[in-house]
Swiss-Prot record:
InterPro entries: SH3-like_dom_sf (IPR036028), SH3_domain (IPR001452), Sho1_SH3 (IPR035522)
Regions of this protein lying in the Cytoplasmic compartment: 1-18, 74-81, 133-295
Major localization class: membrane
Annotated protein name in UniProt: High osmolarity signaling protein SHO1
Organism: Fusarium vanettenii (strain ATCC MYA-4622 / CBS 123669 / FGSC 9596 / NRRL 45880 / 77-13-4)
Assembly with partners or alone: Forms homooligomers.
SMART domains reported in the protein's UniProt record: SH3
Originating gene: SHO1
Keywords, sorted A to Z: Cell membrane, Membrane, SH3 domain, Stress response, Transmembrane, Transmembrane helix
Lineage: Eukaryota, Fungi, Dikarya, Ascomycota, Pezizomycotina
GO biological process: regulation of actin filament polymerization
Length: 295
């Protein structure tokens, strides 16, 4: 439930080396830029006024840093990564414009501010690549593997249905294949009346043989053995995968399994969106492929 989402926890920042390093560098770069902009504003002259656009870039950069801190601290990267990527893309433009305005100047304060903007731009580019990448991509999975805090297990189910444009395939073979007939059996099956329909089947003047209609129209009383049985799990698991996020199985589906972040699973087939996996304790079931990365 959305109401049960946790608040900001510093463990999500301190336990993630990538988040801690980039946020620290970004905050340091912003402090350099902000102090240098203040000094540059004080040292401005009538012939060389301080560009006011730099203040907007400085304020926007602070909003980006705070936003990234809140998203990572609240463990909601999976939910807001698209919005964060859009804001970061706009930040690259603003910060780059600030560099262009301040770099080519004789003032040391303005050059220091431009250096801070350059450092901010580098961090924003890295953030854009991180938040804009799929969680199962190799670079992002590598960075997430160093995080100590576990990803929240309350991720909305719609993200799973939206992965690849489809949901999980059925895991039982209850669908019966269509019955095939020969040309001899279908001989005389033509309907002479354009509106006769099914009501004339088996009646007077019917073009369908009575013996054939009985065999076709009557449903089968029994299904083939094992029609509704569950799929037998495989005996070989040649692949090994590492969980990049925690996942909680659907309580209504006995085929799914739950696992925690960084847990190692054995996988039998990696061709679909849902993989047949086995945990270290011997528990087997299906797991979403975008939560795993092959080793």
């Amino acid at each position: 439930m959305y109401g049960g989402r946790k608040g900001i926890q510093m463990s999500n920042i301190l336990g993630d080396p990538f988040a801690l390093a980039t946020l620290s560098i970004a905050m340091l770069a912003w402090c350099i830029t902000f102090v240098a902009c203040i000094i540059g504003r004080i040292q401005q002259t009538n012939d060389s006024p301080f560009p006011t656009f730099a203040w907007w870039g400085c304020i926007y950069s602070l909003c980006l840093i705070v936003g990234v801190f809140v998203v990572i601290g609240s463990d909601s990267v999976h939910t807001y990564h698209v919005a964060v990527t859009g804001y970061l893309a706009a930040g690259i433009v603003l910060v780059s414009s600030g560099v262009n305005l301040l770099l080519y100047s004789d003032s040391g304060a303005r050059e220091a501010a431009s250096a801070g903007f350059i450092l901010l731009a580098m961090v924003i580019v890295i953030w854009t690549f991180y938040f804009g990448s799929n969680p199962s991509s190799t670079p992002r999975a590598f960075l997430d593997s160093f995080a100590l805090a576990k990803e929240s297990t309350t991720i909305h189910r719609s993200t799973m249905n939206g992965y690849g444009g489809g949901g999980r395939p059925e895991t039982s073979n209850s669908v019966q294949p269509p019955q095939m007939y020969t040309s001899a059996q279908l001989n005389g099956f033509e309907n002479p009346s354009p509106v006769g329909g099914v009501s004339q089947v088996g009646g007077r003047g019917s073009a369908v043989p009575q013996s054939f209609t009985n065999s076709v129209m009557q449903p089968k009383a029994t299904n083939s053995p094992g029609a509704d049985a569950e799929v037998v799990p495989p005996t070989e698991y040649p692949y090994r995968a590492k969980a990049i996020y925690s996942y909680e199985a659907n309580p209504d589906d006995a085929n799914e399994i739950s696992f925690s972040k960084h847990e190692i699973l054995e996988v039998s087939d990696v061709s679909g969106r849902w993989w047949q996996a086995r945990k270290e304790n011997g528990e087997t079931g299906i797991a979403p492929s975008n939560y795993l990365i092959l080793l």
